[in-house]
Amino acid sequence: MAPRRKEKYKLPVPLPEGKILDDMEGNRWALGKMIGSGGFGLIYLAFPTNKPNKDARHVIKLEYQENGPLFSELKFYQRAAKRECIQKWIQQRKLDYLGIPVFYGFGLTDFKGRSYRFMVMERLGIDLQKLLDQNGGFKKLTVLQLGIRMLDVLEYIHENEYVHGDIKAANLLLDFTNPDRVYLADYGLSYRYCPNGNHKQYQEDPRKGHNGTIEFTSLDAHKGVAPSRRSDVEILGYCMLHWLFGKLPWEAKLDDPVAVQTAKTNLLDELPESVLKWAPSGSSCSELVKYLMYVHNLAYDDKPDYQKLKKILNPDGVPLGPLEFSTKVQSVHVRTPAQQKVDSPKATRKPANEFPAKFPKKVHRETRARQREEQEDSQPTMLQSRPAAPENSRTRKIHEYSDIFSEMQSLQQTPSYMSFQGSYCKPYLDCTRRDPIRKPRSLPRYRHTPTGNLGVTDLESSPRFWPAIFQLTLSEETKADVYYYGITIFCLLIFVFLALYFL
């Protein structure tokens, strides 16, 4: 029995993770982590008890049994979206896929004296609203492709006597394993507009007015008329405007449903000038204008010409390619399943500037140490007044080398292997930025200032380097210092080579 319609539905008490649910076909499902909630129900990751998988490929949507939206969605899948029916449609229409989520089962369960209804669905990826929030809008080609994919879905569900009624970016989700596929989800407001082949009659009911998501809902819904096929294609038109420009003409009036209804009426009545005047200068939206003009001329019970609508959105018949959710400012990376593992915290917290190879990591540490040395040379007072930060052994060794060389004041060195021009590890590099990666500056050379009667100015280039050292006339104290530092440097070099070998 269908639950009674209520104005507001109660959000159910969450079920414990690990609870086993039995569907009507005898399949057993283990609840995983709760990943979402809506105005009426909760969404959990789920695992078949006989096939546990770290990458959860199923979700369970549940609500109190007396609630209504999940019941409506369940009836839609049972009547219109069985897997074998979808596959048959794909073959007949020669589609590569159809963007309707796969339905696996349903059932009832009890918890703390309350009865819950649940349904098992395939797991999908990120929704388009999150991508839209990051971008502010999509590329025109992406918007047109999304429209064509949604027309494929709408044609199928309309042929099976249903309308969706709530098309929006939050209800469009990318495939979990293939982000170039998009699915229309959430059929809680789906409506059987043509039961047993008899189309509902046009009848306005102010008590049911402004139903749906106010930004995108159709003029029929504003008037309290039951949704029809033209309602769905009209809603899709508003969505495409929003995806392309990141805004709608009535977005400042959302607190006043009547004002939104008036703005939509004016937009459709004054096409094409209304859209062309409102759209940003230099933008091209002729396809959307033609689409809305066609939709506006549909009668309440007309069947849309889906092929004509797709031809309007793709007049050249270009094959549909990958979906690109990016703008001129940034590019959104849609994660693959390997990056979406729900029970692997390391995968979700991976630093943006982490490099996979060992050698670049070492270069990064050395470059940071070099930058610190340069800052100490240029701002000694600031560094002395600032608390010392913890250093690793590699950094301490570099500081020791600097102290030794400054005390000896007798050697001139060229940059070591740490300063090679091919380095791409700029100090404190933010790898999430799209700025060109700049090469690090070379290490500063230690210049020798001649003092006393020493005649050697470049000991490295001298062919008699070590004989010159032993022929120098030095005091006993200076000789002791030279031997001491020589042994120290030799030992430190051994430690450095050992450290590099085992890193």
From Swiss-Prot:
Top-rank taxon, per record: Eukaryota
Keyword Cytoplasm: yes
Listed SMART domains: S_TKc
Residues covered by region (Disordered): 334-353, 362-395
Active-site residues, Swiss-Prot/TrEMBL: 166
Subcellular location: Cytoplasm; Endoplasmic reticulum membrane; Mitochondrion membrane; Nucleus envelope
GO biological process: cellular response to oxidative stress; regulation of interleukin-1-mediated signaling pathway; regulation of MAPK cascade
Function: Serine/threonine kinase that regulates several signal transduction pathways. Modulates the stress response to hypoxia and cytokines, such as interleukin-1 beta (IL1B) and this is dependent on its interaction with MAPK8IP1, which assembles mitogen-activated protein kinase (MAPK) complexes. Inhibition of signal transmission mediated by the assembly of MAPK8IP1-MAPK complexes reduces JNK phosphorylation and JUN-dependent transcription. Phosphorylates histone H3. Phosphorylates 'Thr-18' of p53/TP53, and thereby increases its stability and activity.
Sequence similarity: Belongs to the protein kinase superfamily. CK1 Ser/Thr protein kinase family. VRK subfamily.
Entry-linked PANTHER family: CASEIN KINASE-RELATED
Protein name: Serine/threonine-protein kinase VRK2
The organism's taxonomic lineage, starting at the top: Eukaryota, Metazoa, Chordata, Craniata, Vertebrata
UniProt gene name: Vrk2
